[in-house]
Swiss-Prot record:
Pfam families in alphabetical order: FA_desaturase (PF00487)
BP term (GO), one: fatty acid biosynthetic process
Native species: Bacillus subtilis (strain 168)
Membrane-related topology note: Multi-pass membrane protein
Protein's UniProt name: Fatty acid desaturase
Length: 352
């Protein structure tokens, strides 16, 4: 098959999937009802259960965390303007769900759009993605950079401490170069979060609020980071230098199909169909599965399950020569192939 034929087929696939990129107001409203009502109901039940048993409270917060994850998926769709047809409604709902999930709407919308435009591009890493080094970059790095990278990639730091740091601290500040509208949106989000937390503390008591909201926040945050991590970090993923990079290949080869049990698939808003989402970000979450089922090429993408996804914990570095993720242990037998004065090595020296 020639490169022109492959390019044509990729273009056709993108067009076909884009046909599903139409929000349906009825489905969106139903999703709001079957997400927000259970979430707030579970939150209140968890509060009431504090007088019975904290183990019962924790059990309820685990379920509530699943619904907060689903709320984040709605927020995510609003950022892509795919939840409602009208941009205004996406902005309003995006702001409100951003307050609940601790994300400033416009800031995350901007960084996430860059993630989509540069996903799997080795020359355009660094915005809206997880820090990833290649084997050659890691071997050429200073001891300090290696230590920082190993700490960053430690599961406890990435999935427990990481969400706390990102959601509570970095999300509260504007990025360098942010426009006025984005900066104001971040300030308003912060004010709304403080106001909501203060109101809950006054109504329920600060201790009760923390005992209920704390576990929900920690669990949903860990779930969110895990989903983002595992859907781009699997053994035979796709990463290329800019000159060889393809948007379609990055979507269907660099984004996994995370095949989850139906209940978990529902709670996570079908985000396991990540290859479909990256191919056409404007497809609403409730249409991702249908788009996947209607196109045979999408059924042949990298597929991972709950069990096999755990293998991703060992994948720390990208091996450019063998086109796959490897563990720290595996690189002992891989020679450095960076030229002495390569741009990558110079960049590493500068950043180290």
């Amino acid at each position: 098959m020639t490169e022109q034929t492959i390019a044509h087929k990729q273009k056709q696939l993108t067009k076909q999937v884009a046909a599903f990129a139409q929000p349906e107001t009825k489905n969106s409203l139903i999703q709001l009802l079957n997400t927000f009502i259970p979430f707030f109901g579970l939150w209140f039940l968890a509060y009431l259960s504090l007088d019975v048993s904290y183990l019962l409270t924790l059990a309820l917060t685990v379920i509530a965390a699943g619904f907060l994850t689903r709320i984040f998926i709605i927020f995510h769709d609003c950022c892509h303007q795919s939840f409602f047809k009208q941009k205004r409604y996406n902005h309003i709902l995006g702001f409100l769900t951003g307050v609940l999930t601790l994300f400033p709407y416009l800031q995350w919308q901007h960084s996430h759009s860059i993630h989509h435009a540069t996903s799997s591009n080795l020359d355009k890493r660094g915005t809206g993605d997880i820090w990833m080094l290649t084997v050659n970059e890691y071997k050429a790095a200073s001891r300090r950079t290696k230590l920082a990278y190993r700490l960053y990639r430690n599961p406890f730091i990435m999935f427990i401490l990481g969400p706390i740091y990102v959601f509570l601290i970095t999300n509260r500040f504007n990025k360098k170069g942010a426009r006025r509208k984005e900066r104001v949106n971040t300030y308003l989000t912060n004010l709304a979060i403080v106001a909501l937390a203060a109101a809950c503390c006054l109504i329920f008591g600060w201790q009760s609020f923390l005992l209920v909201q704390g576990p929900i926040f920690l669990i949903s945050g860990s779930i969110g980071v895990w989903l983002f991590y595992v859907q781009h970090t699997f053994e035979d993923s796709y990463f290329e230098a800019d000159e060889n990079w393809s948007y379609v290949q990055a979507a269907v080869e660099g984004s996994s199909f995370y095949k989850l049990p139906k209940l978990l698939q529902w709670l996570t808003g079908n985000i396991g169909y990540h290859h479909v989402h990256h191919l056409s970000p404007k497809v609403p979450n409730y249409k991702l599965e249908v788009a996947h089922e209607h196109h045979e090429p999408l059924k042949n993408v990298p597929t991972i399950t709950l069990k096999t996804s755990l293998q991703s914990l060992a994948f720390r570095l990208w091996d450019e020569d063998n086109k796959q993720f490897v563990s720290f242990r595996a690189i002992k037998h891989i020679p450095v192939s960076l030229p002495p004065d390569s741009p990558e090595k110079q960049k590493l020296r500068k950043n180290a």
